[in-house]
Design a protein with these regions (language model features):
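Short, structured surface patches at the beginning of a domain
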Residues: 1-135
Length: 135
């Protein structure tokens, strides 16, 4: 099984202490995602990291790590995606639903470190309502 772990941190300003804190937080988040993936899917999986650290606002889906993640989704190179929380993908609900729709189209599971597979149940319900409201 190939599991993608995506982490995004929008750096604001050039404060070295802030940057160090953000990086430490990203490392901790990445470890939590890896541990959650191993807890659900076992130890014998390939883990692939996708990271965006820099001046990349959440609404910008042209982040390098996110583009690489989406390319692997489109090419069916992943079985599971793990994020610490859904807002690491984007805070824009329409962009989140469009992204999730693509993930589901490729039969990829999306879990969060905090909610595990329950995140998909929530997103599946939200996707139905979002599609109804979009029509």
């Amino acid at each position: 099984m190939r599991i993608g772990i995506y982490n995004h941190q929008h750096l604001r300003g050039g404060c070295p202490i802030c940057t160090q804190t953000y990086v430490q937080g990203m490392i901790a988040d990445g470890m939590k995602c890896m541990n959650r993936a191993k807890g659900i899917y076992g130890e014998d999986n390939e883990l692939v990291n996708y990271t965006d650290l820099g001046d990349y606002p959440s609404e910008n889906l042209e982040r390098p790590g996110f583009r690489r993640l989406m390319k692997d989704i489109e090419e069916d190179n992943l079985d599971v995606i793990v994020v610490i929380t859904l807002d690491k993908i984007t805070t824009d609900i329409d962009l989140l639903m469009e992204t999730y729709q693509t993930i589901r189209k490729h039969n990829i599971q999306l879990i969060t470190a905090n909610d595990g597979k329950k995140a998909m149940e929530i997103l599946d319900k939200a996707l139905v309502k979002w599609q109804e409201n979009s029509n």
